[in-house]
């Protein structure tokens, strides 16, 4: 005897997007002397430091508002002595990476390539992916430039990440923009990782012994955009934004 049921009701299952992350972990990577700590402290305090301990690695937090959304930004200022050798401590922690080189130091640019390869290999297949920003620092040293802007843009294009050039000792808003853009990229990746699932079946009579299984249909979301060369422009209006709440730990001399 086969059991028969009447008309099945249409079923729609939709994935509901999660709330935007209220906390974003950003890891700063790069060769020693590239300006990682200077960029971190500039973002946190709006000041440029002239001295710091290159062997100090620590994590700092700042309450920010990005696109009218509050977010707690945690920044890990790393102090790798030999490049990307022991990255376990930050790879699993990070939501985003900012990889820094100095435009007046070609070897720091080559170290960046190693970091990009390490992060790219780790992030492959992760959902959501951890976005990466390639950052050329010390544009105030233009006359000593060893890495052209075209070289930086080409490397970013190769790894599909954003690319900027700034100076930690000059404009604060340009540095702030980099960190806020990292937050935006994390939010975008979170949205991309949500794949809506739609199931719809409408049969007048379905037999348990012969009814085919329901098949889930997935709609693929667009792939992330490739590298973009961004020119950061300051705005006096932006300077009226609320100053971030800062948690700054030991190891820095602020001037």
From Swiss-Prot:
Family to which the UniProt record says this protein belongs: Belongs to the small GTPase superfamily. Ras family.
InterPro entries associated with the record: P-loop_NTPase, Ras-related_GTPase, Small_GTP-bd, Small_GTPase
Record-linked CDD domains: RERG_RasL11_like
This protein's encoding gene: RASL12
Positions annotated to bind GTP: 30-37, 77-81, 137-140
Domain of life, source organism: Eukaryota
Keywords: GTP-binding, Hydrolase, Nucleotide-binding
GO cellular component: plasma membrane
Protein's recorded name: Ras-like protein family member 12
